[in-house]
């Protein structure tokens, strides 16, 4: 492989391609002589669209094929939404870079209603996320939650066709696809705690590829890494994948990190939540400590029931 070429493995969805193009542009900005090529491919999570994500099973539904491409030296790096990245990596691969975070909030999208609180009794809300389901149901047990799969455009099309009264999407994805005008209202972290890593883009590569790691270095964003490390540490200690009713969100003010986390029963009948505060340099320890507290309050019972289903 030429020293002046980097090949990016990416999913084919519009949002994944945006993320890959973003990394491509950043690399070309820092390294004007570099040639960056995209290698688009489909993953299991893209192909199986008729089954709720939580039932497709397995961790890494959206990343495995990209990792195989790197291990087979067909690609040098893979670009991921951090919320889709498993906690464990195949031998020889690792998460090298976490880029600056976009808006981590969820977005409420509807053609007829302004917010979740305005939805009439029995309204149909579309989301494929157990995390979103448990928090919506806890606040509004009268609503009907129905599964929603496909890329952002497909999901918006289903809303516009009248299949749903409202849908919940990640704000970052809508902003990146220049669809911010479709956001009816933002859902605060207090109303719906985001997924760990939501809104952040991560770059995976071969752990022994020093050339590529040096080229990627300028794309690292230190504050985002501390936040995501805390969130992922909590998720990892809970043994959560990306399709579990777990929310985690870290904020940093003056080097102090505040991490909020929750585990919820998908039917909304029980939400276990807590908060940890400490130095940002203790991000991983704070995440583990918060997970331990949630487990001590009964989170394991909820998660075991989800995995059995």
Curated annotation (Swiss-Prot):
Residues bearing PTM S-(dipyrrolylmethanemethyl)cysteine: 242
UniProt keywords, alphabetically: Porphyrin biosynthesis, Transferase
Co-factor binding details: Binds 1 dipyrromethane group covalently.
Signal peptide: none
CC cofactor: dipyrromethane
Classification via Pfam families: Porphobil_deam (PF01379), Porphobil_deamC (PF03900)
A GO term from the CC aspect: cytoplasm
Enzyme class label: transferase
Catalytic reaction(s) noted: 4 porphobilinogen + H2O = hydroxymethylbilane + 4 NH4(+)
Single GO term (MF): hydroxymethylbilane synthase activity
PROSITE patterns per record: PORPHOBILINOGEN_DEAM
Entry EC no(s): 2.5.1.61
Pathway, per record: Porphyrin-containing compound metabolism; protoporphyrin-IX biosynthesis; coproporphyrinogen-III from 5-aminolevulinate: step 2/4
Domain of life: Bacteria
BP-aspect Gene Ontology terms: protoporphyrinogen IX biosynthetic process
More details: The porphobilinogen subunits are added to the dipyrromethane group.
PANTHER family: PORPHOBILINOGEN DEAMINASE
NCBIfam families in the cross-refs: hemC
Protein task: Tetrapolymerization of the monopyrrole PBG into the hydroxymethylbilane pre-uroporphyrinogen in several discrete steps.
Quaternary organization: Monomer.
Sequence similarity: Belongs to the HMBS family.
Name of the featured protein: Porphobilinogen deaminase
Protein species of origin: Shewanella woodyi (strain ATCC 51908 / MS32)
